[in-house]
UniProtKB/Swiss-Prot annotation:
Positions of ATP binding: 206-208, 216-221, 290-291, 334-337
Primary location: cytoplasm
Stated name of the protein: Glycine--tRNA ligase
Catalytic activity: tRNA(Gly) + glycine + ATP = glycyl-tRNA(Gly) + AMP + diphosphate
Subunit structure: Homodimer.
GO cellular component: cytoplasm
Compartment(s) where it occurs, according to its Swiss-Prot or TrEMBL record: Cytoplasm
Cytoplasm as UniProt keyword: yes
Keywords (A to Z) from UniProt: Aminoacyl-tRNA synthetase, ATP-binding, Cytoplasm, Ligase, Nucleotide-binding, Protein biosynthesis
Gene name per UniProt: glyQS
Length: 463
């Protein structure tokens, strides 16, 4: 069925995946809190990323760098001087927009050009398109726009007791720079030889002009980033490797093949530090959106930090005896965006065979489902024995225990939150020590010994 964003958001709020931030005080624009099921889903996704990109990789190691860094870091990286978005205001509604996203939304949704990208356009080119197309503010309905101007995305705060320029620091806008400044520490302490990578998961902050689309674009967000260092000249080979690796990770976790596409950046769209970038985009209900950027950052970052810090970042190649600054490939994935993608991809409303009823179901891969199973006693009289099954399984998996309402309603509730297996403990279970296991997707039921449940679920959640 065609999915709409409102249905996904409504389910996410209703079933405890995501709540509006600070809701009892009227909320705070574009802030979201992950509820009990949302935090399990997101943690499972992060663990799946860490498992494949760090733990099981012969190349990569992990890091957890501080959010607050010496401000010189952001001078060296270019964020203080160049980290800007094109801003435009509608004079009638007084609402501010990112000019490039305003144009993209119009061209993709109104003109039907799904592949239109505004990145790389100059301010004059963007203003010309807005004027020539007569793009209107969706709130006021007018085309009464200001000129386009720059807007710095860094969140500024102060360290210490006085709020002056000497104590000015910033919330990091990306996790990558924490990796670059620790490059030598990691390389030396772990005795790593090229090629190798450093990955981390952490919060970043960007004062976005027009955040929106639920958790797709927020000012506080979490990144899963890998900086992979290689010999200059080998960067395109490794970029292709990580493109394939990242795409396979998504498909293996259940994302549908026709829901994603790979899009190479045009030359005029590339960031100043990149000689090649490919985005893995997902087809959200609101249109195609960037999910994963795989960029060849060349030696830009290490060169900049070498120049600003005075440290030598050259690598001594033991095979060729050469010294050079490594090139870097960066696969950067937004944890919140990919969580939204998994929610959208899993969401379905479908008819029930042999019935006029419909059910809402989240078809999560078992590896990322918030609960791997739910134990359901057929009657509350059986709860004392059924809880023993729950306790046995919860030693290895996240498991729900639900004894309220009819068994049919409990099945539907578990379908809505994406639980792959419902385990019904009935009166026969007292005698034969077997339970009925219901599959979420097929709704088929099989009888199984309680002693085999651990092995059964372990096999199903393997990734």
């Amino acid at each position: 069925m065609a999915k709409d964003m409102d249905s996904v958001v409504q389910l996410a709020k209703h079933r405890g995946f995501v709540f509006p931030g600070s809701e009892i005080y009227g909320g705070l624009s574009n802030t979201w809190d992950y509820g009990p099921l949302g935090v399990e889903l997101k943690n499972n996704i992060k663990q799946a990323w860490w498992k494949k990109f760090i733990s099981q990789s012969p190349y990569n190691v992990g890091l957890d760098a501080a959010i607050l860094m010496n401000p010189r870091t952001w001078e060296a990286s270019g964020h203080l001087g160049n980290f800007n978005d094109p801003m435009i205001d509608n004079k009638d509604s007084k609402i501010r927009y990112r000019a490039d996203k305003l144009i993209e939304d119009y061209m993709q949704n109104e003109k039907g050009d799904e592949n239109f990208i505004a990145d790389g356009l100059s301010f004059d080119e963007m203003k010309r398109i807005i004027d020539e197309e007569g793009i209107k503010d969706p709130v006021s309905g007018t085309s009464n726009w200001t000129d386009i101007r720059q807007f710095n995305l860094m969140f500024k705060t102060f360290q210490g007791v006085t709020e002056d320029s000497t104590n000015e620091i910033f919330l990091r806008p990306e996790t990558a720079q924490g990796i670059f400044v620790n490059y030598k520490n990691v390389q030396r302490s772990m005795r790593k030889k090229l090629p190798f990578g450093i990955g981390q998961i952490g919060k970043s902050f960007r004062n976005e002009i027009t955040p929106g689309n639920f958790i797709f674009r927020t000012r506080e967000f979490e990144q899963m980033e890998l900086e992979f260092f290689c010999k200059p000249g080998e960067e395109i080979e490794w970029q292709n490797y990580w493109k394939t690796f990242a795409e396979k990770w998504l498909l293996d976790l259940g994302i549908k093949n026709d829901s994603i596409r790979l899009r190479d950046h045009d030359e005029d769209e590339l960031s100043h530090y990149s000689n090649a970038t490919t985005d893995i985009e997902y087809k959200f209900p609101f249109g195609w959106g960037e999910l994963w950027g795989i960029a060849s950052r060349t030696d830009y970052d290490l060169k900049q930090h070498s120049e600003f810090s005075g440290d030598d970042f050259k690598y001594h190649d033991p095979e060729t005896n050469e010294k050079y600054i490594p090139y870097c490939i960066e696969p950067s994935l937004g944890a919140d965006r990919v969580t939204l993608a998994f929610l959208c991809d899993a969401y379905d409303r479908e008819g029930v065979e042999g019935s006029k009823d419909e059910r809402t179901v989240l078809h999560f891969h078992p590896a990322i489902a918030p609960y791997k199973a739910a134990v359901l006693p057929l009657s509350k009289k059986l709860s004392e024995e059924a809880i023993k099954v729950y306790e046995q399984l919860s030693e290895n998996f996240t498991v729900d225990f639900d004894e309220s309402q009819s068994i049919g309603k409990r099945y539907r509730r578990q379908d809505e939150i994406g639980t792959p297996y419902c385990i019904t403990f009935d009166f026969d279970s007292l005698e034969d020590q077997q339970v009925t296991v219901r599959d979420r997707d097929s709704m088929e039921q099989v009888r199984m010994p309680i002693s085999e449940l651990n092995d059964f679920i372990s096999e199903k959640v393997r990734f």
